[in-house]
A protein has these predicted regions:
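Hydrophobic core segments within long, regular secondary-structure runs in both alpha-
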Residues: 151-155, 229-234, 290-297
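Active-site activation/catalytic loop segments of kinase-like enzymes and analogous catalytic loops
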Residues: 203-245, 262-280
């Protein structure tokens, strides 16, 4: 790691602070200083994040890790713009995201390789179901939640997905537009912010990404169509020859993705309840819980039927 000293101008960015520093040889460079949010340790494993960053950086993903301190880290600066939600569905960009995601999923991170989805969901559930709010209106809304029902939904979905034999990969788990950057001049795409990264089910990572097509307004009518999904799948499964992907492989990944998409809604719904209690950010996290959980219930019947029909098919199909 290079020694740097002296801080010049700094500018707050969406993913941290851009800081100009002068090296010992007099050269001025830009770096990014990321500060962890208060109470984020309740939902993020920082030790796991730091371990992953080193290996992912070596594989060409994200910014280089330059140093760590008590409540944050220093990384190299990426000269690129953050994508918008509409950017992600543009065919050329969707294909590039798919190709990069395949490569991301091939990175080997040492350590515990068990998928973390259901461990995390049940951990979140345990915390989310025992909260108390000082704000009486928040407490009233919170008490309208049937955690018995939520737990039953988690158990049913976990059982269904267990039959899909989804590959376990090192997953980003939070591939929204804000964690994708593009250098338009070089046409280079970057994945950033691996704080939720872990070994997980492939379909969860892709389904979670598709949920983010809804954008910051959470308009789930923008969820990608089957045609858009197949375009993504072709470039994910066969980056060099996407048109040669078989219909069988496309349908298998379609079922896998759209079943685990439901798990994405449950994951972030329970996460939101913890944030409603712990986060100092002025955001309606309770409202976000209901938004995600209601979307889960809206999509559940069709997605369960899709998976059950697929699993019941003759094995030679």
């Amino acid at each position: 790691m290079q020694t740097v000293f002296g801080c010049g101008e700094s500018e707050e960015k969406e993913n941290g602070f851009e800081v100009s520093v002068r090296e010992e040889d007099g050269n001025l460079i830009n770096i990014t200083v990321r500060l962890y949010g208060p109470n984020t340790e309740y939902v993020i494993d920082r030790e796991r994040e730091l371990q992953a960053i080193g290996y992912l950086s070596a594989a060409g993903f994200g910014a280089k890790l330059l140093g760590v301190f008590g409540n944050g880290m220093v990384q190299s600066f990426i000269y690129a713009r953050t994508l918008t939600p509409p950017d992600m569905r543009k065919p050329k960009l969707a294909a590039e995201i798919a190709k990069q995601l395949r490569r991301f999923h091939q990175v080997e991170i040492p350590g515990f390789r068990e998928p973390q989805l259901w461990n995390e969901v049940f951990k979140f559930f345990k915390k989310a179901s025992t909260l108390k709010f000082d704000d009486s209106e928040k407490q009233r809304k919170y008490e309208t939640i049937s955690f018995e029902e939520v737990e039953a939904e988690v158990v049913k979905l976990k059982e269904l997905t267990s039959h899909l034999a989804a590959p376990v990969v090192f997953a980003h788990n939070d591939l929204l537009s804000g964690n994708l950057m593009l250098n338009d001049v070089e046409e280079k795409l970057y994945f950033i912010d691996f704080e939720y990264g872990s070994y997980n089910y492939r379909g969860f990572d892709i389904g979670n990404h598709f949920n983010e097509y809804a954008g910051y307004d959470c308009d789930y009518s923008l969820y990608p169509s089957k045609v858009e999904q197949f375009h993504f799948f072709r470039h994910y499964l066969e980056p060099e020859k996407p048109l040669e992907v078989s219909d069988k492989d496309l349908q298998a990944l379609y079922v896998e993705t759209n079943t685990y998409m439901l798990a994405s809604h449950l994951y972030w719904a329970l996460w939101a309840l913890i944030q409603a209690k712990m986060s100092p950010i002025d955001f309606d996290y309770l409202g976000y819980f209901f938004l995600r959980y209601n979307e889960y219930k809206k999509q559940k019947e069709n997605c369960f039927l899709l998976a059950q029909s697929y699993l019941a098919r003759p094995l030679n199909e």
